[in-house]
């Protein structure tokens, strides 16, 4: 698996040079005509997006002051932290439960365990397409988190038929599916100043990673497997916080626009 993943990074890296459209000031002309490039630049200007050079932002007191005196860095960081901590699938609960049944060999457990991330791919496509074409950002995030909440409730109760547990484990990747919606929306709110956007996104991910690092160790202790009552309750609480924070984000976004 590690060899396959390593090889795929080369494929992605090479593909990026060929397929990535570039930036407004340094576009790739392999797929875009000059007319299309000019249209892209015009649309950016109409939406108030800076389309200048893409040099790394220079940190200054003025830049930091503008970031930390604005609501975005605080609200978006909190939103992102709740999102990072509402996903339980990273701790192997599905595989540990399958193994605890004593019905399958290790290879069979690994094979069956593929179902959850496989469904997760479908959820990612559905949630992100529905965000643009049907439900909108708020609706798609609500759908992802409500599905996750249903999964967490079943796993917290635990004393349910095995079929219910199968269902719960195979829908709990739904919360991950909203990742692109969250970061796309965040980028949209930060689009007016690229320096502030870059620093704010780094802060969001740094704080979220730090919170994720300790929360998993505390809430999903392997010795408690296969029933992570504390962990699933923690994930449920964070899903509820994601839902609540999303409404706050929408309010400030509308006010900004």
What residues fall within each predicted segment?
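C-terminal transmembrane helical hairpin of 12-TM major facilitator-type secondary transporters
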Residues: 133-185
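Extracytoplasmic gate region of multi-pass secondary transporters
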Residues: 59-129, 212-217
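Hydrophobic alpha-helical transmembrane and interfacial-helix anchor sites in secondary transporters
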Residues: 130, 186, 222-223, 231
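A generic transmembrane-helix signature of 12-TM secondary carrier transporters
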Residues: 6-16, 80, 145, 149-152, ...
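A late C-terminal transmembrane helix in Major Facilitator Superfamily
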Residues: 194-228, 234-238
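Transmembrane alpha-helical cores of Major Facilitator Superfamily
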Residues: 3, 81, 114-118, 146, ...
């Amino acid at each position: 698996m590690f060899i396959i993943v390593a090889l795929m990074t080369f494929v992605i890296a090479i593909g990026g040079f060929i397929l990535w459209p570039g930036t407004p000031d340094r576009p790739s002309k392999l797929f875009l005509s000059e007319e299309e490039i000019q249209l892209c630049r015009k649309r950016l200007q109409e939406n108030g997006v800076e389309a200048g050079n893409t040099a790394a932002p220079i940190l200054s007191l003025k830049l930091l002051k503008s970031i930390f005196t604005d609501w975005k860095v605080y609200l978006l960081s909190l939103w992102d932290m709740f999102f990072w901590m509402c996903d339980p699938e990273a701790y192997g609960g599905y595989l540990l439960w399958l193994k605890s049944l004593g019905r399958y060999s290790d290879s069979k457990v690994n094979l069956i365990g593929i179902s959850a991330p496989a469904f997760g791919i479908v959820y990612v496509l559905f949630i992100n397409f529905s965000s643009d074409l049907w439900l909108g950002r708020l609706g798609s995030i609500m759908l992802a988190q409500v599905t996750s909440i249903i999964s967490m409730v079943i796993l917290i109760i635990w004393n349910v038929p095995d079929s219910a547990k199968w269902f719960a484990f195979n829908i709990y990747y739904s919360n991950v599916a909203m990742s692109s919606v969250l970061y796309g929306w965040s980028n949209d709110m930060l689009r007016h100043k690229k320096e502030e956007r870059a620093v704010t996104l780094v802060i969001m991910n740094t704080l979220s990673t730090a919170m994720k690092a300790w929360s998993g160790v505390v809430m999903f202790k392997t010795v408690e497997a296969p029933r992570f009552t504390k962990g699933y309750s923690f994930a449920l609480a964070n899903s509820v916080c994601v839902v609540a924070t999303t409404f706050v984000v929408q309010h400030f976004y509308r006010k900004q626009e």
